[in-house]
C-alpha cells in the first residue's frame, strides 16, 4: 500500500502538542478574568445609604403583606372547618416532590383516568324548585322505592321532565335523544340522578319500563371522557333478540358522541362480527356465550371497560349463564374502578348474591306494586296492574280450536291488524301451532330456538310491521323484546314457572298502556294454581271458580323433566365443619 503524502500546509493545520508553558499562560489569563469579574460585582453591590434604607423598608412591607395573606388564608380555613391537611396544601411554599413521588402521582392520575367520571351530577335549579309535595306524589303514584345503603334519607330527587336534567354534551345534541319521548319513565326518573353521579345501581322493574334508555344515557355520558381506544363499556343481554334491540338504542345514542357500538350474538357470522370489532368498538352489546368466545380467542379485551351493564340479570341466571357473567365481569377493571348497573324484573337470592359480589354499595330502585321488600329481602313478584288477565280452564285437546276462536274474535273490523302474541312451552309445539293457524288462513309467523337467526329476525320484523299480526313464540321471546303495540297475549301452554308467566304477559301493557292476556289452564298445570291465584289477586283480577278447584297452595317449583327450580339452603349461610365420631 502506497504511503500518503502531506504538504507543509496540511501539517501546519493539524493541532500541535501542548507544552507546559502554554498551560501556565492559560491559567494566568483565567485568573485575571475571574479577578476583574469579582471587582465589577463588588462595585455594583455597594448601594448608597438612601437606597439601602428604602430597600429595607420595602422588604419589611413585603414580609408584612405576606404574613397578612397567610393569616387571611388561615381564617378562611377555620371558617370552613377545614382539617389540618388542606391547610398544609394551601401553604405558599409547598415542599418539592422527589422523582419517586412524582412518578407515583402520575401513575395514580393515569389509573384514575380509566374510570368513568363520578360525582359530576349537579341537581338543576329547575328540579330544585319543584315542591316536595309534587316529588312525594310522583314517588307514591308510581310506587317507586329507593334504597341507598350509604344513607337513610335519599336526597337526590327524581327527574320529572327532560329539561330538569343537567346540561351535558350529549343532551345538547340535535336532534335530542329524547325527541320521541314525552317524559322520563319512572325507572329513568329515579335512576338517572344516581347513575349520572357515578353510583352503582340495581333497577327492579317490569319489562317495557324504559330500562334501556335508563342505562344508555349514563353509559355514553360516563365513557365520553375516556380517551383510550379500547372497549369502554359492555352490555350483556340474555337473548339474541334483546341484544339486537338494545344495540339499536345504544347505537343511536352513542352516534351522537361519535362512538362506535358493536352487537355480538350467536347464530351470526363470527368473521363479520370480528371485522366490526377490529375497526374499533367503544361499546359492546352481547349475549354471554358469543362474548365469551371472542374473549377466549383474544379478539375482545375488557380490561379497560369502565362501565358494565347486566340487562335482565335474573333471566341470565335462569338460563345458566352465572359462570359466564362472573368471567366477563372479572375481566373488567375491579368493581371499585368501574360503574356497574344491573336491571332485573325479579330480585331472587341468586341475583342478590351476584350484586353483592360485583357491585359497590349499589342503590336499589324498585318500581311498581311489587317493589317493597319481603322479610327475606326479596322483592315480591307481581304482574302489571294495567294488564287485564283472564284464565280459561280447558281440556288439553281443546286448546288449539279454542285458540282459533279467540283469534277470530279479536281480529274483526278495526282490530284486524292488532298484534297478538301466542306463547307455547316447547319448540315442536310452537311449530305445530304455527302450521295449524297457517292452514286455517291466519297470517302468522314464528320465533323459537329451532329457527335460524335470519328466520327469527324476519319473523320479528314482519310482526312489528303488521305484515303478520300473529306471532307464535317460545319463552325465548318472553323477556326483554320491545315489541310495541301488542294488544293481546295468549298462553296456549302454561310456562314452567310463575315468573315466566309474569314476563310473558308483560309483552302487552307496556309504556303506560293497557293490554290483555288470556291463559289456557289444564289439569296438567295444577301445580301452578296457587301461584297463579296469588298473581291474579295481587293485580285485582278475577279468579275463576274452576281454577280454585285445583287448590291455592303454593308449591315449590319442580318439573318432571327439568328437575327442581329451588334450593333448600340459605345461600348466605356460612359453611360448617362436619366432625365424625
From Swiss-Prot:
Ranges of Basic residues compositional bias?
A: 63-73
GO MF terms on file?
A: ATP binding; ATP hydrolysis activity; RNA binding; RNA helicase activity
Composition-biased stretches, type Low complexity, lie in: 80-89, 106-118
The question of whether Phosphoprotein is a record keyword is answered with: no
Q: Where is this region: Disordered?
A: 1-118
Identify the main location.
nucleus
Per the Swiss-Prot or TrEMBL annotation, the motif Q motif is positioned at 160-189
Q: Where is this motif: DEAD box?
A: 311-314
For ATP, which residues are the binding ones? 205-212
SMART domains the record matches? DEXDc, HELICc
Query: Which PROSITE patterns does UniProt cross-reference here?
Result: DEAD_ATP_HELICASE, HELICASE_ATP_BIND_1, HELICASE_CTER, Q_MOTIF
Taking every annotated instance into account, which residue ranges of this chain make up the domain Helicase C-terminal?
402-551
What does the record list as GO biological process? rRNA processing
The entry's keywords: ATP-binding, Helicase, Hydrolase, Nucleotide-binding, Nucleus, Ribosome biogenesis, RNA-binding, rRNA processing
> Does the keyword section mention Acetylation?
no
**GO-annotated cellular components:** nucleolus
Domain Helicase ATP-binding as annotated: residue spans: 192-365
Q: Which reaction does it catalyse?
A: ATP + H2O = ADP + phosphate + H(+)
What InterPro entries does its record include?
Answer: DEAD/DEAH_box_helicase_dom, Helicase_ATP-bd, Helicase_C-like, P-loop_NTPase, RNA-helicase_DEAD-box_CS
Q: Where is the composition biased (Basic and acidic residues)?
A: 7-35, 53-62
Q: Which PANTHER family match?
A: ATP-DEPENDENT RNA HELICASE DBP3
Q: What does this protein do?
A: ATP-dependent RNA helicase required for 60S ribosomal subunit synthesis. Involved in efficient pre-rRNA processing, predominantly at site A3, which is necessary for the normal formation of 25S and 5.8S rRNAs.
Q: Which family does it belong to?
A: Belongs to the DEAD box helicase family. DDX5/DBP2 subfamily.
Free-text comment on this protein's domains from its UniProt entry? The Q motif is unique to and characteristic of the DEAD box family of RNA helicases and controls ATP binding and hydrolysis.
Supply the name of the protein. Answer: ATP-dependent RNA helicase DBP3
Q: Which source organism does the UniProt entry give?
A: Gibberella zeae (strain ATCC MYA-4620 / CBS 123657 / FGSC 9075 / NRRL 31084 / PH-1) (Wheat head blight fungus)
